[in-house]
Amino acid sequence: MRISKPHLRITSIQCYVCLLLNTHFLTEAGIRVFILGCISAGIPKTEANWEDVRKDLQKIENLIQSLHMDATLYTESDVHPRCKVTTMNCFLLELEVISHESRDGDIEETVKNLILLANSSLSSNGNITESGCKVCEELEEKNITEFLESFKHIVQMFINPP
């Protein structure tokens, strides 16, 4: 299985070492800048994952239009910001239903990729416990078009937090 992550950040420590050795960075402040630069280079960048999730979601939407699926899926249309992780997990579970019912190789591969990207981004949120949120089965059942529109909205909430 191929996972496409075009926005992976490749960092070269050699640039920092060269900068350190070729300048008069041997002061306490210079060393701090060097250390902070090295640390910031290693911090994972999850925003790119959400952009890739959004692109995969658009691809799924285009592929589904040609199949004319009529499934109904649990959909949260009014996501509260404090419940976005719980809601995203519900959307990911329902996405598996689309993959199963479509029986289309392209959709299945794109769904798997989307789920991997979303889960890797969600793992950066740690084990967040959100109380007062609806469980998946309490959500309203809607058609695929409405489901995908709501899904895009919640992905946008992760890209641009309120």
Curated annotation (Swiss-Prot):
Disulfide bond sites: 83-133, 90-136
Residues making up the propeptide: 30-48
Gene Ontology biological-process entries: immune response; interleukin-15-mediated signaling pathway; neutrophil activation; positive regulation of cytokine production; positive regulation of immune response; positive regulation of peptidyl-tyrosine phosphorylation; positive regulation of phagocytosis; positive regulation of T cell proliferation
Locations listed in the record: Secreted
Chief location: secreted
GO cellular component: extracellular space
Keyword Glycoprotein: yes
The keyword Transmembrane is assigned to this record: no
UniProt-annotated glycosylation sites, renumbered to this chain: 119, 127, 143
Pfam families per record: IL15
Cited InterPro entries: 4_helix_cytokine-like_core (IPR009079), IL-15 (IPR020439), IL-15/IL-21_fam (IPR003443), IL-15_mml (IPR020466)
Keywords noted in UniProt: Cytokine, Disulfide bond, Glycoprotein, Secreted, Signal
Signal sequence region: 1-29
PANTHER family per UniProt: INTERLEUKIN-15 (PTHR14356:SF3), INTERLEUKIN-15-RELATED (PTHR14356)
Function according to Swiss-Prot or TrEMBL: Cytokine that plays a major role in the development of inflammatory and protective immune responses to microbial invaders and parasites by modulating immune cells of both the innate and adaptive immune systems. Stimulates the proliferation of natural killer cells, T-cells and B-cells and promotes the secretion of several cytokines. In monocytes, induces the production of IL8 and monocyte chemotactic protein 1/CCL2, two chemokines that attract neutrophils and monocytes respectively to sites of infection.
Family: Belongs to the IL-15/IL-21 family.
Identification of the protein by name: Interleukin-15
Organism: Marmota himalayana (Himalayan marmot)
Upper lineage: Eukaryota, Metazoa, Chordata, Craniata, Vertebrata
